């Protein structure tokens, strides 16, 4: 963590699951300050009390800023002195964004533009924008707005000399706020049916710790305008539900199929065919460089030696598919799940 020594990190949307995961990773390091920028004062107050109680010796490093990424002035007021930004503020519930698409535009599109504008004005060293697999071949409002977020980030990076801007794409982050596993646990404990949308639907899965790892990899190894993804495994929704049943004593026969919700796909894509054509294989990650040609399309060719991706498209149907045993082990290893099994209260539950 030496690269963050004495630095100030801002996390937009910082009261969410990702912000909590970053805090737990960074608080006991040599980082100077972590700024939590969000619009919900109740969540900030809850977080303040939780961290003062559980991390009394280092909680002073957390500074809270009430504001909304939709307001450029709001973002600007919190920006001076910031060295790095993890931009996690977003509307991410697919059905909600289908019914209120302009709200998704205001947060995911205009909000991102505001954060990047203020960051460039203040010579912030690096901004990592958190995106989603739904931004690749998007069919729903959430995915479309996150795709535009990525386009804004890449466009801003072309003229950004002092601020590095990268995007990271995630699949489903297990046990994050608003995700399905906590809902299933609640349904099992209350004796209600375990609801899933479509048994054969596949999704990439990753832990919150892996989500933080991806952002740190982008921070350390990404170039201006890059999009980076992890080589995540996938499983069917049916397998995931059965794994949660196995861990919490649910019954397979209690699983109830309720049908695909508004805007959902049968499978998700982390890298499109077009992106795979230029993606660099970096071990556990892929890096998609920005196309930095100008509108004159001046053609030039350079000889490179990077290892290109050898797949035509990276999606949750053609990636490694976890079986029930593997899925159960991956879910069971999560800190959130261990806490739930052992009766320990989770932060930002």
Predicted feature residues:
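N-terminal Rossmann NAD(P)H-binding glycine-rich loop of SDR-like oxidoreductase domains
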Residues: 7-29
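Rossmann-fold scaffold of SDR-type NAD(P)-dependent oxidoreductases
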Residues: 12, 79-88, 129
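Conserved glycine-rich Rossmann-like NAD(P)H-binding loop of the short-chain dehydrogenase/reductase
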Residues: 30-43
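Conserved residues in the N-terminal Rossmann fold of short-chain dehydrogenase/reductase
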Residues: 38, 65-66, 106, 198, ...
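Conserved Rossmann-fold cofactor-binding substructure of NAD(P)-dependent oxidoreductases
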Residues: 63-84
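Hydrophobic/aromatic anchor residues within beta-strands of the central parallel beta-sheet
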Residues: 64, 104, 127, 165-168
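Conserved Rossmann-fold NAD(P)-dependent oxidoreductase catalytic core, especially the SDR/UDP-sugar
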Residues: 87, 91-151
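Strand-loop microenvironment adjacent to phosphate/nucleotide-handling motifs in alpha/beta enzyme folds
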Residues: 121, 151-175, 179-349
């Amino acid at each position: 963590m030496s690269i963050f020594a004495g630095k100030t990190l801002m996390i937009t949307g910082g009261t969410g699951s990702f912000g909590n995961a970053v805090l737990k990773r960074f608080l006991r390091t040599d980082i100077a300050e972590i700024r939590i920028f969000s619009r919900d004062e109740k969540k900030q107050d809850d977080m303040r009390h939780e961290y003062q109680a559980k991390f009394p010796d280092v909680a002073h490093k957390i500074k809270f800023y009430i504001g909304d990424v939709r307001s450029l002035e709001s973002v600007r007021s919190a920006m001076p002195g910031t060295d790095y930004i993890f931009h996690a503020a977003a509307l991410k519930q697919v059905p909600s964004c289908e019914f209120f698409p302009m709200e998704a535009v205001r947060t995911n599109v205009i909000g991102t533009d505001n954060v990047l504008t203020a960051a460039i004005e203040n010579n912030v060293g690096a901004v990592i924008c958190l995106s989603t697999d739904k931004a690749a071949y998007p069919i729903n409002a959430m995915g479309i707005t996150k795709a535009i977020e990525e386009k804004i980030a890449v466009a801003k990076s072309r003229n950004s000399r002092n601020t590095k801007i990268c995007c990271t794409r995630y699949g489903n982050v297990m046990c994050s706020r608003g995700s399905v596993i906590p809902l299933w646990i609640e349904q099992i404990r209350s004796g209600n049916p375990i609801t899933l949308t479509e048994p054969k639907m596949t999704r990439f899965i990753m832990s919150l710790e892996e989500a933080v790892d991806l952002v740190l990899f982008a921070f350390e190894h990404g170039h201006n305008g890059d999009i980076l993804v992890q080589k995540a495994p996938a499983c069917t929704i049916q397998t995931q539900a059965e794994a949660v049943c196995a861990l919490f004593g649910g019954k397979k026969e209690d699983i109830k199929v309720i049908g695909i919700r508004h805007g959902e796909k049968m499978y998700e894509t982390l890298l499109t065919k077009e992106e795979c054509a230029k993606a660099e294989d970096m071990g556990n990650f892929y890096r998609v460089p920005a196309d930095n040609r100008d509108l004159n399309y001046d053609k030039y060719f350079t000889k490179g030696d990077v290892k290109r991706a050898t797949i035509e498209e990276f999606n949750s149907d053609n990636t490694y598919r976890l079986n029930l045993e593997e899925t159960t082990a991956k879910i069971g290893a999560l800190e959130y799940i261990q806490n739930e099994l052992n009766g320990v209260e989770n932060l930002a539950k």
